[in-house]
Amino acid sequence: MVLALAELLALALWFSASAVIPQLTAAWDLSSAQQSWMTMSVQLGFVVGALFSALLNIADRISNRYLIAVSASIGALLNGAVPVFDAGPDLTLALRFGTGFMLAGVYPPGMKLVATWCKEDRGLGIGILVGAITLGSAMPHLLNAVPLFGDQGIPAWQTVLLTTSGMAFLSALLVGIFVQVGPHLSKTAPFDWRFIGRTLSHRPTRLANFGYLGHMWELYAMWAWTPFLLLASYEAAGWSTQGARLAGFGVVGIGMVGSVVAGLLADRMGRTVITSWSLGISGGCALVVGLFFDHPGLLTALCLIWGIAVVADSAQFSTAVTELTDSRYVGTALTLQTSMGFLLTLLTIRMIPPLVDWVGWEGGFIVLAIGPVFGVISMLRLRGLPEAAQMASGKR
């Protein structure tokens, strides 16, 4: 669908700077903290933007088509300003924050738009969208592995950032021209700042959000640092670093398969079942992945399995919220959910580098398994509630 393609293109902005951290470090002599903040600043900007949108019910009061198109365009400008003005570390972090803020107007509204087109197959629909977002998030790693316009096979960081900005501009055009609202759109909601409080106090929605938080504890730290785990492993074994970059793209991008398959299965078997299995598999991978550091081939295979499982459940937490919450405020509920999840990622993304310095790559990811355990407990508790019958046409 056109919307999925547009989200894929726009979300290439997310890791555009993170993918080229080695080149930026060589150019600007980045510290370890600055390297982490190249990703964390986007997360923080997204959180602030999502909370702003949730408080004002923006996703339920403004045309989502135009919200996505305008947000993607401004995000592209902010991202492109980094190479155009050779911004340096401090200004780049500010521009990355702004990019994240604008992506809050792309991701949650996109899920709401899909929900207007889907009912019985909503899990699959949102799964396809999140799969496209996953592949889009991986695109900078692919661009960074393509030896075009580069020195000794390494592309200039400016090329990667400018290309992703161009992709986001194309996304805005696609949404503005081709995307339409579906037949299941609820009436425009009146402004109600108290809706956030009602959502947080509604136990079924709260448990779905708890499951999402367990998932997010793991996801973005895995996406941010697994490519560098692979790079370190490949270098230690004398393998091609370009191969490591391609593997990094594959590990993130393959999550698209997990999202689509999990969406298809969740509509037939239930959201709580599929999310629990996905969390269990990904948590297990987090526990053992470091043990394969000295075997890059096996490490790559395990990381690909992890890449499928770690994001397979993501769309189903969001779908559950659309089924459990007041239909007039679906956009606000999704924005609130994502803001809480991305706020949590700030902790785990920043946590991995010092853990790796302390225990090495072999044990640096074990802490990520805490999230899946918490998530499984939350989803099993949700499954036991009567309201769970509202999900997946009664399949819970």
Features from the language model and the residues they span:
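Juxtamembrane intracellular "pre-TM" segments in multi-pass secondary transporters
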Residues: 181-210, 396
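Intracellular juxtamembrane helix-capping segments at the cytosolic ends
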Residues: 105-118, 312-326
